[in-house]
Amino acid sequence: MALRCINNLEIFLRRCTAPTLHRCCVASSRTAHTASSSKGSGGDNSKDKENNGQNKSGYRSFGWRSAFQFCVPFSLGALVSAVLIERHRDELTPTISARSLKGRRNEFNFIADVVAGCGDSVVYIEIKDTRHFDYFSGQPITASNGSGFVIEQNGLILTNAHVVINKPHTMVQVRLSDGRTFPATIEDVDQTSDLATLRIQVSGLPVMKLGKSSTLRSGEWVVALGSPLALSNTVTAGVISATQRASQELGLRNRDINYLQTDAAITFGNSGGPLVNLDGEAIGVNSMKVTAGISFAIPIDYVKVFLERAAERRKKGSAHKTGYPVKRYMGITMLTLTPDILFELKSRSQNMPNNLMHGVLVWKVIVGSPAHSGGLQPGDIVTHINKKEIKNSSDVYDALAEGRKDLEIVILRGVKQMHVKITPEDP
């Protein structure tokens, strides 16, 4: 292409310059001829000199014309071709790079596609304390919060039981993804599976599709949606670490559930939100976090059984609450420290005592609760209550059931041992 441009430009310049050079040569020869005629016939020496002069002039004219006709077109052609090639290269390079990056972005943005398809069905749940009011707005303050997702267009919402129950003197509010807020009523509760449903009076809501947890594989990509720390519409992603994590391994002796373990971040406020696969289907309900990279969700297959039983109860008009009776209220969410969990905690933190063999980890404290007023903090480890050793969460429930007014609790906060006193509330 470049060679063709050079040849074409050379031919063009030759055609343009040849007539001018020819006229110059003709004029020069006519001048020389006139001068020789005016002198007449001179001597032989004068003629020889004149002839020698004409030969030299013709030689000089022929050399200059040949050099000009060859060098100028070639130089100009090469220069123009080089400029055109460089400009053409500059124009092509960014275009190729932009197309390549755009294609890769669309190819690997699968998580964004999942969120766009199902994010509108996720809701933010607030628990309002009706005894305490904000000084400026006059509205009840938020005692705790959680997440949920719409499973029926007529306002049925699924969440965790611990998000909405065992909280006396409170009311439940639900905020949709479009910003609208509605009061909610608790329809069904099963504390055994830690599941509950809420109802708001609105219709035409976007619904979350329910998938199958039985087909999950370890290493499969999942996305956790919810409102951690009251930050609505938060998205985290990870993989399934284990599909059959037995409740006994987590110290939950009253439950017969094989939890989904994931490294997707599930923090305070994510509880009750959906854990979805790359098809945008809920395959679990976010339940609890032990530490960074270790979180658990209730498999959706257990959720379907709960929903079927709840629908049957509603048809029969029976009581909507099932499971264990409501206990005295302390205001914490806890997890038994099994050997596996202890090993993980000790490997991730240098502040864990080496001689710690058992206890209960406090991983959430509800603001305004007796535990919060007594000084408990997330991350504390309960080792004794009323001078009795605590080995699992059942021991804590037993201490609450004893009916004593105050609980004398021994905790580990880092490497320090501390004593706190809590007065639980009656239901």
Swiss-Prot record:
Annotated InterPro entries: PDZ, PDZ_6, PDZ_sf, Peptidase_S1_PA, Peptidase_S1C
* Record localization: Mitochondrion intermembrane space; Mitochondrion membrane
SMART domains associated with the record:
PDZ (SM00228)
Question: Biological process (GO) annotations?
Answer: apoptotic process; positive regulation of apoptotic process; proteolysis
Q: Name one GO molecular function term.
A: serine-type endopeptidase activity
Q: Does the keyword Acetylation apply?
A: no
Q: How does it sit in the membrane?
A: Single-pass membrane protein
Query: What's a Pfam family this protein contains?
Result: Trypsin_2
Spell out the family assignment given in the record's similarity comment: Belongs to the peptidase S1C family.
Annotated protein name in UniProt: Serine protease HTRA2, mitochondrial
**Designated gene of the protein:** HtrA2
